[in-house]
Structure formats: structure tokens, C-alpha cells
Design a protein with these regions (language model features):
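A short, N-terminal "cap"/entry segment at the start of jelly-roll beta-barrel domains
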Residues: 1-33, 44, 110-113
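Short strand-connecting beta-turns/loops that link adjacent beta-strands
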Residues: 28-29, 50, 94-95
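Short, conserved beta-strand element in jelly-roll/cupin
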Residues: 36-38, 48-64
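Histidine-centered metal-chelating micro-motifs
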Residues: 42-44, 63, 79, 83-89
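Structural motif
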Residues: 61-63, 70, 86, 96
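Short acidic-glycine-tyrosine-enriched beta hairpin
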Residues: 68-83
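Ligand-binding loop in jelly-roll beta-barrel domains
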Residues: 83-109
């Protein structure tokens, strides 16, 4: 039987020295992670060979940088990232941002820089 998932019970990890992530769903064919980024934080520009991702902002503002443009996502907005598309999530605002990263299949081990 499935159990409710939350950041209180999920496996936690730190990335980029100042950002947090919680594995809400961790399966071979699906990953759902809640992440938190403080102001000024950003991930390394990268792409995934197989994983299709969907970033969905829960609170705050997230900038998704692509080669040719930047997309600013507000609370309750999301964006799909196709496999092979270079991208970089950034928090260029003055407030913390929390968001979901949904990957299918999971993106662990699939990241290219």
C-alpha cells in the first residue's frame, strides 16, 4: 500500500552547497523531487540524454535559462524540458523558491554537462 509522501519523511540531500532536495518518489521510471533554492543559487547548465523533466514552482520565482532565452516561472507555473535540451535553473529573485522536479525516467546518472 502506498503511503503519503512529504519532506518530513522523504530522503533529504544537499546540492550546490546551499540547496535542498527531498526524494518524494524514487523509482526507476519516475522521480519526483521537491527542491529549495535560496536567493542567488543556481545549478550547473546541463542536459539529460533520456529523462524528460517538468519543473513546477510551488512558492517563489524560478528562472529557467536556455541557450537562447530565459523563462521566469511564478508560483503555480511549470515548464517541460525535453531530453537533450540544455537548461539551468536559477533563483535570481530576493526570496527562496521551492519547486517540484518530475523526471521520467529518473534523471539520476543521466546528467550531461
Amino acid at each position: 500500500m502506498s503511503e503519503p509522501a512529504s519532506t518530513a519523511t522523504a530522503d533529504h540531500y544537499v546540492w550546490g552547497e546551499v540547496c535542498d532536495g527531498w526524494h518524494l518518489v524514487r523509482a526507476e521510471n519516475l522521480s519526483v523531487i521537491e527542491e529549495r533554492m535560496p536567493p542567488g543559487a543556481e545549478e550547473e547548465r546541463h542536459w539529460h540524454e533520456r529523462a524528460r523533466q517538468f519543473f513546477y514552482v510551488l512558492e517563489g520565482e524560478l528562472t529557467m535559462q536556455f541557450d537562447d532565452r530565459a523563462v521566469i516561472l511564478q508560483s503555480r507555473q511549470g515548464i517541460e524540458i525535453a531530453p537533450g535540451l540544455p537548461h539551468q535553473a536559477k533563483n535570481t529573485s530576493n526570496a527562496e523558491v521551492s519547486f517540484l522536479v518530475i523526471s521520467q525516467p529518473r534523471s539520476h546518472g543521466d546528467r550531461q554537462t
